[in-house]
Swiss-Prot record:
HAMAP family: MutS. Residues 1-20 are annotated as: Disordered. This protein is involved in the repair of mismatches in DNA. It is possible that it carries out the mismatch recognition step. This protein has a weak ATPase activity. Residues 1-11 have a biased composition (Low complexity). It comes from the Bacteria. Transmembrane segments: none annotated. Belongs to the DNA mismatch repair MutS family. This is DNA mismatch repair protein MutS. It holds the Pfam family MutS_V. ATP binds at G656, P657, N658, M659, A660, G661, K662, S663. GO terms for biological process: mismatch repair. The keyword Hydrolase does not apply.
Amino acid sequence: MTIRPDIALPPDAAPPPEAPAKMSPMMEQYHEIKAANPGLLLFYRMGDFYELFFEDAEIASRALGITLTKRGKHLGADIPMCGVPVERSDDYLHRLIALGHRVAVCEQTEDPAAARARKSVVRRDVVRLITPGTLTEDTLLDARANNYLLAIARARGSAGADRIGLAWIDISTGEFCVTECSTAELAATLARINPNEAIVPDALYSDTELAPTLRELAAVTPLTRDVFDSATAERRLCDYFAVATMDGLAALSRLEATAAAACVTYVDRTQLGKRPPLSPPAREATGSTMAIDPATRANLELTRTLAGERRGSLLDAIDCTVTAAGSRLLAQRLAAPLTDAATIARRLDAVEAFAVDSGLREQIRSSLRAAPDMARALARLSLGRGGPRDLANLRDGIRAADEVLVQLAQLASPPQEIASAMAALQRPSRELCAELGRALADDLPLLKRDGGFVREGYEPALDETRKLRDASRLVVASMQARYADDTGIKALKIRHNNVLGYFVEVSAQHGEKLMAPPLNATFIHRQTLAGQVRFTTAELGEIEAKIANAGDRALGLELEIFDRLAGSIDAAGDDLRAAAHAFALLDVATALAKLASDDNYVRPEVDESLAFAIEGGRHPVVEQALKRAGEPFIANACDLSPGPAQKNGQIWLLTGPNMAGKSTFLRQNALIALLAQVGSFVPAIRARIGIVDRLFSRVGAADDLARGRSTFMVEMVETAAILNQASERALVILDEIGRGTATFDGLSIAWAAIEHLHEQNRCRSLFATHYHELTALSAKLPRLFNATVRVKEWRGEVVFLHEVLPGSADRSYGIQVAKLAGLPPSVVSRAKAVLAKLEANDRGQPKTLIDDLPLFAITARAPAEAAPPSEAEQLIDAVKALHPDEMTPREALDALYALKAKLPKAD
């Protein structure tokens, strides 16, 4: 019988079909197994196929694009059916899991011949429950990404102050973490963890406030209340980790323990009692990582672009790792930048050690390329899903550890993080490595059931059995030669398949000869095909039995050896996992050092101040794209540091035309801060960054039609979150606030937002806008600094120089950008005419906007209109505005022509 997983049925899932009073034994068995596994697609093994029936078949047919057929009837209606071949099932499983489906794999657990002897249906049992968060096979996993299962528990508080406990594990690597947060922090925490599956109590699944957030981020599986029972949580954790008390584990809060217990309970059930080895839950302290909400992660394209692609993201740009485990660790660090300056410094020390020693760095990277994914090999072996190549991976990992240790010995005084890695690499047993080396053959099969993975000479009993098996096969070869001579049929062959066993095969024309006396007494006709006829003999049957028995005995001995070796590995699991993590750590450190060396990154100074001073900053992703195109990136400085020595302002108000690079400038400074707190060198000449506790980005917006939100509503929701949550340690980048509504509405909102950031949040901020009127705020807000992106006009065209300078822009050059975008010439021409008229009308108004709007009355009043300057004064002002040292010869010549044009014309 199947072990019932007790996984609750999602509210929108149909129950399994009821079994009628009379049905075939096979269909009766199917209904029984399906009823024990509600809410999962049942892959029901029938020969060489997994078949799906009823609603499962309809779901799988749509999801996989395979033909929906029918098999018999149920309650008078056709039974929907579809199937997938067993040998290609991993491909189909991968697609179903990626769509959020969960699957129960039901195998035949006895030989069909035995079932026929019993005159009964073949026994079948569910041997695996596959869910998005509990994968271990390489064929189903992304090698460069973690596969997290997340459990969420909630405790109700007064006045809506609920607390959330979270626990997440990756059973393919053994990682296990817990934390606690408020409901306001939940979205940012979920975005950081990025789980593949979330398990929640039924009540939380139905919660109107939280459920939409959960379903946006992961496949959500609701479970019954007992899984989240806080009264039994500690007992379940102690049972899983085989400890007497929680003293042997981390000090967890009640909520954290509840979520952690839910995780291990779900794993225990989905793995049908097999327990993957997990590290004890590591507790993440509140505030230990930079908080980044989902919108900011998306806007900054940290791990995926807005189109959902890895290519073009920050992770893609900086990932120089050479191992899958290193790539996973880098992604983890990028998702959770640290807020502890001392820990950041230790990471930077490791990167610097390899940045200054390119020879050692490349030696380490070369050795790491040979290091396999030890953590995932361990997990597969512990769950009984491993193969001979997993054993070899662990053998090769220990060998690589010795090689890396020899190389690291060149460091006279290794930094703390490297020293810790060296200690971890020394932990695995070298005797275990030697034993694996003696046991495993050079050429290994993928599956242990294929045999042939034990080296000749390792086990004498196995060698003897193999000799007997192989000798029998030589007898078959000699029999073929003898049969060919006896019959006079030189083309006679002895072949083998799983249906007939060993058989004699001849052409159709020779078949009649073997079916005629006297040869028919020896050769028994079994099968006629289009061009061949097949026969068996009593002698062949005897030999086949000997070969089968010898082969079965040989495979049995090999499987015993495999289990013995796997047991030794399981006993050494903690040491091997520590070495696997050390490899990943060294891979990340050497990869970031290579990035720094290749792209001229510098070590940032990260401290507990509120400083933010970047000299020669660059956008890491855009710079790489330009480099591939053979173009330079224009670096820019940014100083948001507070205090008396402040050169500029804590809030920069950035104006300039479209396409000038404002958004790139905003993003690059956010990414530099993030990289610094990840523990990476940064793309700049110099960088000093005081710890950023929260990073906010409101750059671009799109409709959220599913929630009935317009583009402007999405923009306002994101802006509200920033203004309500940003502390003085936050870094805020805002682009074009208020552009999605009427001009005066948008201008008013942007104005008020700047004042709030300045007076209430008091955080480091970059604010880009096309509302040039906002630059007047610098007169009343002392920490507001106006900056602009430099452009040049040349013969009616605009040239973007991408330089950020003090000052403000008076034009946005929107029509020029529209022309570059390919608007029809007639539209561009008409737009210029309309703009000229609007600007003329604006100049003719007796009062400026700052006088018109009460909103702006708090700023300094505009001075009385002065008499227009004389022509001589205009010439003097024009000359004063020139900066010869900053001009190219061409620009100087143009300026001279412009001055000449201003001279009064002679009568």
